[in-house]
Amino acid sequence: MAMKNLLSLARRSQRRLFLTQATRSSSSFSAIDSVPASASPTALSPPPPHLMPYDHAAEIIKNKIKKLENPDKRFLKYASPHPILASHNHILSAPETRVTTLPNGLRVATESNLSAKTATVGVWIDAGSRFESDETNGTAHFLEHMIFKGTDRRTVRALEEEIEDIGGHLNAYTSREQTTYYAKVLDSNVNQALDVLADILQNSKFEEQRINRERDVILREMQEVEGQTDEVVLDHLHATAFQYTPLGRTILGPAQNVKSITREDLQNYIKTHYTASRMVIAAAGAVKHEEVVEQVKKLFTKLSSDPTTTSQLVANEPASFTGSEVRMIDDDLPLAQFAVAFEGASWTDPDSVALMVMQTMLGSWNKNVGGGKHVGSDLTQRVAINEIAESIMAFNTNYKDTGLFGVYAVAKADCLDDLSYAIMYEVTKLAYRVSDADVTRARNQLKSSLLLHMDGTSPIAEDIGRQLLTYGRRIPTAELFARIDAVDASTVKRVANKYIYDKDIAISAIGPIQDLPDYNKFRRRTYWNRY
């Protein structure tokens, strides 16, 4: 009986095996039948081999490199790291920035938020210390002071009282490439603020006694700036990095120029640089675009029409980066301060966004703020744990045709060697050891920082004015975030290899810096032996 059962099981197994083979054979026949008649059995190619994981990774890398080497030309003008489009829905849902260009070339740009109770209106001018000569260096800053010293319609006192009576705030600042005059007022005083701005920019009197009085004020300001070592370090950094070029000049200018600037110099600077085509009227908050445009048409009627553009001026005197250093030993200072920088990207360079992410990856840290030792940045974590600095800050400065990317640090004299090694180690590491987690963290921190910075009408107006002067348009937040999200670890490595790895550096240092390594040691640490 047991033998019969075994034989029965054997027959069933053979029957199942036969049915399985028959099914497989019929599938093979079906596949052959589906081949076109013109193809002979011998023409059948063997099945392709399975794609190995490293082959798949190599294909992804090739596609990314292809995108990086052949970016969409539409984005080259606007600093996109590689072609990627933002969602149109997000862009359209953001507050609209409306721009109107008047016949004389003056641009009026607004972002309306009628629920706000305040507004900021200002004039952003494509003029700064970069567009001066050695003889006139300091004129732009001197003019910023003199512009509030009375017009044909308003005395100095009347101007100050008018702004105070409406609860407003009037201010100005000068940088290397831009000058700005702006007013923050209540929603009912926007037209009055525009009238004040138009008056001071077109009808300032520049009385000789006022000029002489302001000359002394600026000389005292220069003494105050010389006492701010961080300002001195960064001014010296520009002077050595861009030596013998316009970007190397200071904003305040040398003392001998301040002592010799005349009324004619101020008037000539306005005529040649405060031109309609180089100016943007920006407004944000409780403003209506049509009303602002009409007011600007009515008020800004005396602007110069000099055809010279900043692009022509930059082309005539381009910035040139020079690997070099400047050191000032001062043992009276309690701490040493220094900055080390590489040549960075311009505003419109496709790599500028990646450098912003890299700046965030390096981060900043201050011993007195209490940020903690276990922060996300490898550099700040190394500095904090080993206690080799009082503060440290990565910076990324953009200009029309170049930039500066580097680190500024404050430390005790006996920590300089360890600190300089840590800085160069972590900065150079960006060229070949970057994790996706670090890049993602930096992207999120950067986006958060940008959003927090845009809180208020004044930062929004400043953003509008600056972007129209640098990009020619206002970049929507959603589009900017899409560009930031397009930066990954491979992008960071590529950009770091382009701007950092084995590249010249500029160094500026002040204080008890005898133990700061020499230039050649810094330079050798811009590369590693990776073999």
UniProtKB/Swiss-Prot annotation:
**List of catalytic residues:** 144, 214
* Catalytic reactions on record: Release of N-terminal transit peptides from precursor proteins imported into the mitochondrion, typically with Arg in position P2
Q: How is its activity regulated?
A: Binding to the alpha subunit is required for catalytic activity.
Organelle targeting sequence: 1-78
Could you give the cofactor binding note from the entry? Binds 1 zinc ion per subunit.
- Gene Ontology biological process terms, A to Z: proteolysis
Cofactors named for this entry:
Zn(2+)
Note down the stretches annotated as region Disordered.
30-50
Q: Which GO terms describe its cellular component?
A: chloroplast; cytosol; mitochondrial inner membrane; mitochondrial intermembrane space; mitochondrial matrix; mitochondrial outer membrane; mitochondrion; nucleolus
Quaternary state and interactors: Heterodimer of an alpha subunit and a beta subunit subunits, forming the mitochondrial processing protease (MPP) in which the alpha subunit is involved in substrate recognition and binding and the beta subunit is the catalytic subunit. Component of the ubiquinol-cytochrome c oxidoreductase (cytochrome b-c1 complex, complex III, CIII), a multisubunit enzyme composed of 10 subunits.
Listed PANTHER family? GH01077P, METALLOPROTEASE
Q: What is this protein called?
A: Probable mitochondrial-processing peptidase subunit beta, mitochondrial
- Gene from which this protein is expressed: MPPbeta
